[in-house]
């Protein structure tokens, strides 16, 4: 083991395993290993750079961030949530309760619930689509129109004016009229 101290206050120690430990005046440390691995001890975190290019940041609050060579970034939070940012810009959040939220590069949001039901919000038209475990689907448009397709194929549509149209699987159409407008005051 050999230690050199420089006028700048830096201290470099060559350890028996061939690694180099640099202590800086600000209290941070840099540890370089013979295999190319580098570990940096900072005030708020420990940063590790693996020989294969993977970077791992361990924060004092328990957050761990791993950045892969392909640009994928994975963040493990102390509460158990995992947030992954993919090279294409998509972001996935896995929550402790089992829900998964995915924001696609185009802004579309897809939330998969623990019970396997799925809610999708399409950014291009603001439409929300709810796919339930039983197979039924509810779609809600920005203008207030709602359409539900039941597992037997029955389609129920409610329009913004309050009118409801139901089309049964046998082709029967049931339609209600829109409620009358409120009289002027």
Regions found by a protein language model. Give the residues of each.
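Repetitive, compositionally biased segments used for assembly/scaffolding
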Residues: 1-185
């Amino acid at each position: 083991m050999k230690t050199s101290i420089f006028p700048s206050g830096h201290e470099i120690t060559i350890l028996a395993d061939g690694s180099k430990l640099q202590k800086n005046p600000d209290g941070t440390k840099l540890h370089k290993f013979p295999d190319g691995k580098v570990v940096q001890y900072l005030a708020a975190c420990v940063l590790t750079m693996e020989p294969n290019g993977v970077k791992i940041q361990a924060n004092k609050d328990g957050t761990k961030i791993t950045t892969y060579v392909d640009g994928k970034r994975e963040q493990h939070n102390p509460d158990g949530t995992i947030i992954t940012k993919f090279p294409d810009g998509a972001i996935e959040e896995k929550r402790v309760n089992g829900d998964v939220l995915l924001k696609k590069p185009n802004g579309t949001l897809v939330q998969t619930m623990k019970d396997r039901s799925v809610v999708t919000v399409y950014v291009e038209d603001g439409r929300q689509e709810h796919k339930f475990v039983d197979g039924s689907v509810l779609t809600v448009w920005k203008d207030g129109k709602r359409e539900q397709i039941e597992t037997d194929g029955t389609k129920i549509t409610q329009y913004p004016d309050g009118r409801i149209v139901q089309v049964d699987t046998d082709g029967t159409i049931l339609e209600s009229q829109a409620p009358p407008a409120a009289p002027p005051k």
